């Protein structure tokens, strides 16, 4: 697309979605189409639709949603850390990376942060925040972390928008954490417990066993 086309597309785009999203589209339109990148595919489809080029729009195949096997590399995660430094989502990103919990849970921790619920070990600097939040099959009992937390006025949509603006997809942080923990030899059941994937019929004793195991294994990842 020419610069004039990109400007016209952008002005039309902001009528429907946020400025950040439209900026992201324009950035992708400055590069060749990458069929393996969902954002790139989306940007080019939006552009061709806006242009009225239905043939080109149809030609871009959206990948069938199968299992997403992408796991970011350590180098990629380090890049993300550099990107968030000094931004309003830096602490949130660190919490996601340290704990492996979902974005909704990390947002809840920071937006309702209560120091009374945060137990920190002065010897290891590892903290365990009691969240005890269930919805459906999702249960986050504890959030393990290292960074010092503080209450922040952050909402899920605002956080997601800022992270997307930096080209960071929260679900991949979660996948990175799970993969790294398993690589370090942390049992899958403990990884599930740390990430809030605990079955509803769990017995109290087994739950306490998992908490004990989580305390034992988490330092392997925290280091």
Give the location of each predicted region.
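Basic, Lys/Arg- and aromatic-enriched nucleic-acid-binding interface segment
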Residues: 72-103, 170-174
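Catalytic-site neighborhood detector that most strongly recognizes the C-terminal catalytic loop/helix
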Residues: 195-223
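Active-site/catalytic core of tyrosine-dependent DNA strand-transfer enzymes
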Residues: 28, 137-177, 182-189
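Flexible interdomain linker/hinge and immediately adjacent N-terminus
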Residues: 49-79, 132-138
């Amino acid at each position: 697309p020419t610069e004039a086309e990109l400007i016209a597309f952008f002005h039309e785009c902001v009528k429907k979605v946020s400025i950040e999203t439209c900026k992201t589209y324009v950035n992708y339109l400055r590069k060749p189409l990458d069929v393996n990148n969902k954002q790139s595919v989306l940007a080019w489809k939006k552009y061709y639709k806006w242009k009225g080029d239905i043939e080109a729009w149809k030609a871009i195949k959206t990948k069938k949603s199968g299992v997403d096997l992408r796991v970011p590399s350590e180098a990629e995660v380090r890049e993300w850390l550099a990107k968030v430094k000094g931004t309003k989502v830096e602490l949130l990103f660190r919490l996601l990376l340290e704990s492996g919990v979902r974005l909704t849970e990390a947002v809840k921790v920071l937006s309702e942060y209560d120091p009374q619920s945060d137990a920190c070990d002065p010897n290891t600097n590892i903290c365990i925040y009691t969240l005890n939040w269930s919805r459906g099959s999702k249960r986050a009992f504890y959030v393990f972390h290292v960074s010092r937390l503080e209450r922040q006025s952050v909402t899920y949509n605002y956080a997601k928008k800022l992270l997307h603006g930096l080209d960071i997809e929260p679900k991949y942080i979660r996948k990175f954490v799970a993969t790294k923990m398993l690589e370090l030899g942390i049992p899958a059941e403990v990884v599930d417990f740390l990430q809030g994937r605990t079955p509803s019929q769990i017995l109290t004793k087994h739950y306490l066993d998992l908490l004990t195991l989580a305390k034992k294994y988490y330092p392997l990842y925290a280091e």
